[in-house]
């Protein structure tokens, strides 16, 4: 809205004695009637949030086959994705694990994926990260397996607050994480730092180092 001073107005419109109280003033109101469009459109474009998390609660199953294709941001206390007993998961989505403490407030976790029992998780793609891990509690596994669980990684990007805990299996368990692809931040899955024979790069694959990232590719 633009207001114009009439061109015929002269110096008599100036305030008396330069006192702002006497300055000319205009008061008006505006009423807008609008119809909401069927699609979003704003200064950021209508696709700026297309990769936003669609799932905001942890997912847990103890049986059956399940596929995750929508991006997640959920509590990582016990795993944003929790595979238990005989459950089987296939993941091709971003999974952001939010640091969460237990009820006592003494211990916390930020696991993107946790597999237990005889479960199996196949990760084909996505971005896996931790959110809000405090500096005084960086010991949080990103991808974790225990029991007899099996995790297979075919692709995706993985970045943990403490890179040494990107992939981990519980000591003394029969769990295993097999890597056939993916990019890992400051973590070499062919030379893991936590436990022997827990994390393995599958035969026919090798690691290529590129800056801060370790990429698993076929021979």
PLM regions and their residue ranges:
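The right-handed parallel beta-helix/beta-solenoid scaffold, focusing on the short coil/turn
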Residues: 64-66, 70, 77-79, 85-89, ...
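Extracellular beta-strand/beta-solenoid scaffold signature
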Residues: 53-60, 74-82, 100-116, 131-146, ...
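Generic short beta-strand segments
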Residues: 2-8, 70-73, 94-98, 127
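C-terminal, structured domain-capping segment
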Residues: 1-56
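Acidic Ser/Thr/Pro-rich low-complexity disordered segments
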Residues: 44-46, 61, 184
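Short loop/turn segments at secondary-structure transitions that flank enzyme active sites
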Residues: 34-38, 129, 185
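Short acidic, Gly/Pro-enriched loop/turn segments at secondary-structure junctions
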Residues: 40-44, 102-104, 190-191
